Design a protein with these regions (language model features):
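Bacterial N-terminal signal peptides that target proteins for export
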Residues: 1-9
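Polar helix-capping/helix-linker motif
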Residues: 2, 122-123
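C-terminal segment of classical bacterial N-terminal signal peptides
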Residues: 13-23
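N-terminal secretory/targeting leader peptides
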Residues: 23-116, 123, 127-340
Length: 340
């Protein structure tokens, strides 16, 4: 009898140890649609994975999948449906799905991706959480790239009217409405398609942060850069996790994971974008692209023409049950504080 009990106890202990070992080897599979050298991967997702492993004391590891699982717009559902555990993408790639996230794409928010990203996350937590726009997944973080500017191969842009009828690639979201207001013909394509549409004449130019011009090797396809102080737009990104996978982690592991996500990831991402933009500007000038900045008169007209964007977002926020004016005021105050 004693041998039988001992055997049972041994089996139970062995099973517990096996389960513990299995739990200790939790691996989060990250879907990726960008080259491994892109700042999102090299300077954000991969370092975040190391931070997760360190924060969880090796109990949770992060693995970037070697091949894309779908087009960029599919990545929210790729996480939601459990095809991958973690994904990132652009909110504006799925028009109509998100509304509150457009706040981070409004014109003239600032020149620092780090400041805007942190302020954006804080605003999301404080004002947008109850609207649950990311329902079906665990929202790990939100962030933006640096200020968006105008690049083209046709003519220098000195006044707002110079933009009329130019075919410009835009990434979706609020910049689509902005481009139409300015008389631009918007061309929709994910960023990895930029080289193709510019060299094939599908687009005359592109709206991008400085970083993206050398990265996507489109510097030879462009002649002019128009800098917009505080940015014509930013692009809003999400980092999300399959809800069931998140809930499968222990409470301690969840807390550790979130300690390096949320604001910590927004800071990491924003800082990486700012550094990449600085390097991008150096490359743009070295490539011989003519750089100009809109003067005060052009900026005054631009701000007047684009005032509709804020009003439109405030209406969307109201529809979602959010005090948009309070949220936007808070976000701008945080950006100003963080930019000092």
């Amino acid at each position: 009898m004693r041998k039988y009990v001992a055997a049972l106890l041994g089996a139970a202990v062995g099973a517990a140890m096996t389960a513990s070992a299995a739990h200790a080897e939790t691996t989060l599979r990250v879907a990726n649609w960008l080259p491994p050298t892109h700042p999102i991967m090299k300077d954000m997702v991969v370092p975040w994975g190391k931070m997760v492993e360190e924060a969880t004391k090796g109990k949770v590891k992060v693995e970037v999948l070697p091949a894309p699982l779908g087009a960029p717009p599919a990545h929210f559902d790729i996480a939601k449906d459990g095809i991958a555990d973690v994904t990132y993408s652009v909110h504006g790639y799925t028009p109509g799905r998100f509304a509150l996230t457009d706040v981070a794409e409004l014109p003239f928010l600032g020149n620092s991706a780090e400041a805007i990203s942190i302020a954006y996350w804080r605003t999301t937590e404080k004002y947008f959480a109850k609207a649950d726009e990311h329902k079906g997944v665990k929202l790990l973080s939100v962030f933006v790239h640096g200020p968006g500017h105008i690049f083209n191969a046709k003519r220098p842009i000195k006044a707002v009217g110079d933009l009329k009828d130019l075919k410009i690639r835009v990434g979706g979201g609020i910049i689509n409405d902005i481009s139409k207001e300015l008389g631009i013909v918007p061309i929709h394509a994910p960023s990895p398609k930029s080289y193709e549409i510019l060299t094939n004449g599908v687009a005359d130019g592109i709206m991008f942060p400085s970083e993206s011009v050398p990265f996507f090797k489109i510097d030879k396809a462009l002649k002019y850069m128009t800098e917009v102080p505080d940015g014509l737009y930013n692009t809003s990104f999400f980092l999300v996790m399959n809800q069931a996978k998140f809930e499968s982690l222990s409470k301690d592991e969840q807390a550790a994971l979130m300690s390096v996500s949320g604001e910590a990831f927004a800071r990491l991402a924003g800082k990486a974008w700012d550094a990449a933009d600085a390097a991008g500007m150096t490359a743009i000038k070295a490539a011989g692209i003519e750089v100009s900045k809109l003067d005060d008169a052009a900026m005054a007209e631009l701000k007047k023409r684009l005032a509709f964007a804020e009003a439109k977002w405030l209406d969307k926020a109201k529809e979602r049950g959010v005090d948009g004016l309070a949220a936007l005021s808070y976000m701008r105050a945080e950006i100003a504080k963080l930019s000092k």
